[in-house]
Every structure is written in structure tokens, then in C-alpha cells.
């Protein structure tokens, strides 16, 4: 048990298939978990339903990356009707916020009417992304966030999306359950080159892709961004490529929903 998590220890734990949890958001105690069965979602086997594809193409949500990591983790930790407590306690929150500041933890945000209504966060190490938690305050927001995450991982050459535990929700979108032995083989393949040559998947590749401009039902990200009065826009001096100095890339011409559907491939 410990109430402090060193970021280097946390990354080393991920590299060996272990991650932290707690029994309650009200405690400072943390324990380490190594499941006998592991949930993963192979990026090339994401199940995109026709209904979800339609929602994504409509660009109902403005989807961003790394724009409000702390808000995402706080909303993931909030109790809900289905989940009255959370394992995201103060030491775990602090550890992942520190990883985010170091460039290892990332978030996906879904905005609707200027409100953060869905999202997820996780850890990037090598060619692996370890999904930690997601939330949704309106229907389909977390599904849209996951779809955008998978598209980002595909174009960034990631090979492993770790879901930790399988759920019916994740299984419906392509997640599978594998043995610990199988998982460790995949994990080694995904992270070993990081420790030898610092090779890693490219989190920002997606932001450099242009939207499908022929989609008449979609607003471009440039127009969405200009029209939106979002918390992260205040005080941000955008450079010519749409990147805020010192922050993760967010191009004004990054993909719209039509391009995300195209990147995800076959609709099931």
C-alpha cells in the first residue's frame, strides 16, 4: 500500500502489465492489479455500427485531444447511478496528471453546446495505449470518444489498445478478452522498442489530416473552433498550424467525422 505514486514507477508498472487501483475515491490507499484475463481492443478490429457512424458523420460533438485532461479525469471520478464510487482517488489523480504534464497521459474530449459531455483518458508508452476510464453525460458521447481514440491510434501506428477489463459495452465495439500470457507477449512487442530506441506511436498524426470537405452535412473543424466559446480557447495564442504553444497539436483543419468514419474502415 502507498499514497504516493512515482511517475517512473507507474510507467515501469505499465511496461510489465500492472496498473494501480483503489477501493474508493475517499481513500489514499493504492494497490496494484495484474488481471489473469485482459481486455484489449485491436485498433484494426474496431466495430463501427451504422448508428454510431451516422452520429460521428453528423459532427454533433466537437472532439478534441488533450484540451482539458484534468476535467476529464475529474468527470471520470464522479459517482453516477451505475457507479456510486470510483477507484480514482487523490494519489491516482495526481499521478496521471503528472504523467500528462510529462507527455505520457492523454485525453479525448467530446463537447456539446460548449459543455464537456464525454471523454476518456489513458497512458501512451511505446506503441501501446492503456485506456484508464471514460465518462458520458449524454448518449453516445463516450462511444464517439472511443471511436476518435481508435482512429488516432490507427493513424499513429499503435499496435495495442489495453482496456484492462472486458465489458459488454467494450465487447460490442470490438474488445476481446485474452490470457495474461498472450497479453504479455503483445505488450512486450508494443513497448520494448521504447526502452531501447525511444520508439513510440505518434499521438499527433491524426491532427495533421484534413477533413473530408465534400461532406455537406459536416462543419470543418476550423468553423467549429471559430464558432465555439469553449473553456480551452480563452487566452490561447494559436500558431499558424493551429497548435497552441507548448500544448499538444490541435489543427484547425484536423479531420471531421466523415474522415474518422473513413479511417475506422468497415461499418458493421
Curated annotation (Swiss-Prot):
It is found in: Cytoplasm. Its EC number is 2.3.2.6. GO terms for molecular function: leucyl-tRNA--protein transferase activity. The keyword Transferase applies. InterPro entries: Acyl_CoA_acyltransferase, Leu/Phe-tRNA_Trfase, Leu/Phe-tRNA_Trfase_C. GO terms for biological process: protein catabolic process. One of its GO terms (cellular component) is cytoplasm. It is an enzyme of class 2 (transferase). The keyword Transferase applies. It catalyses: N-terminal L-lysyl-[protein] + L-leucyl-tRNA(Leu) = N-terminal L-leucyl-L-lysyl-[protein] + tRNA(Leu) + H(+); N-terminal L-arginyl-[protein] + L-leucyl-tRNA(Leu) = N-terminal L-leucyl-L-arginyl-[protein] + tRNA(Leu) + H(+); L-phenylalanyl-tRNA(Phe) + an N-terminal L-alpha-aminoacyl-[protein] = an N-terminal L-phenylalanyl-L-alpha-aminoacyl-[protein] + tRNA(Phe). Keywords: Acyltransferase, Cytoplasm, Transferase. PANTHER family: LEUCYL/PHENYLALANYL-TRNA--PROTEIN TRANSFERASE (PTHR30098), LEUCYL_PHENYLALANYL-TRNA--PROTEIN TRANSFERASE (PTHR30098:SF2). Belongs to the L/F-transferase family. Functions in the N-end rule pathway of protein degradation where it conjugates Leu, Phe and, less efficiently, Met from aminoacyl-tRNAs to the N-termini of proteins containing an N-terminal arginine or lysine. This is Leucyl/phenylalanyl-tRNA--protein transferase. The lineage of its organism: Bacteria, Pseudomonadati, Pseudomonadota, Alphaproteobacteria, Sphingomonadales.
Amino acid at each position: 500500500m502507498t499514497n504516493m505514486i512515482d511517475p517512473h514507477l507507474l510507467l515501469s508498472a505499465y511496461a510489465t502489465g500492472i496498473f494501480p487501483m483503489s477501493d474508493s475515491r475517499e481513500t489514499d490507499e493504492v494497490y496494484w492489479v495484474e488481471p489473469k484475463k485482459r481486455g484489449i481492443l485491436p485498433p484494426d478490429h474496431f466495430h463501427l455500427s451504422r448508428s454510431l457512424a451516422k452520429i460521428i458523420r453528423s459532427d454533433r460533438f466537437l472532439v478534441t485531444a488533450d484540451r482539458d485532461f484534468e476535467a476529464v479525469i475529474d468527470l471520470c471520478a464522479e459517482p453516477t447511478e451505475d457507479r456510486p464510487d470510483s477507484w480514482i482517488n487523490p494519489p491516482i489523480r495526481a499521478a496521471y496528471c503528472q504523467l500528462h504534464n510529462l507527455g505520457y497521459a492523454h485525453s479525448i474530449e467530446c463537447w456539446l453546446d460548449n459543455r464537456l459531455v464525454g471523454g476518456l483518458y489513458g497512458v501512451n508508452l511505446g506503441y501501446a495505449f492503456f485506456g484508464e476510464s471514460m465518462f458520458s453525460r449524454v448518449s453516445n458521447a463516450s462511444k464517439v470518444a472511443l471511436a476518435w481514440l481508435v482512429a488516432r491510434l490507427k493513424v499513429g501506428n499503435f499496435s495495442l489498445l489495453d482496456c484492462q477489463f472486458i465489458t459488454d459495452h467494450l465487447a460490442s465495439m470490438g474488445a476481446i478478452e485474452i490470457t495474461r500470457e498472450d497479453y504479455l507477449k503483445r505488450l512486450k512487442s508494443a513497448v520494448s522498442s521504447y526502452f531501447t530506441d525511444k520508439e513510440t506511436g505518434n499521438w499527433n498524426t491524426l491532427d495533421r489530416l484534413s477533413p473530408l470537405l465534400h461532406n455537406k452535412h459536416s462543419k470543418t473543424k476550423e468553423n467549429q473552433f471559430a464558432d465555439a466559446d469553449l473553456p480551452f480557447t480563452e487566452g490561447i495564442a494559436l500558431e499558424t498550424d493551429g497548435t497552441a504553444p507548448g500544448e499538444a497539436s490541435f489543427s484547425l483543419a484536423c479531420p471531421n467525422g466523415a474522415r474518422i468514419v473513413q479511417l475506422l474502415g468497415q461499418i458493421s
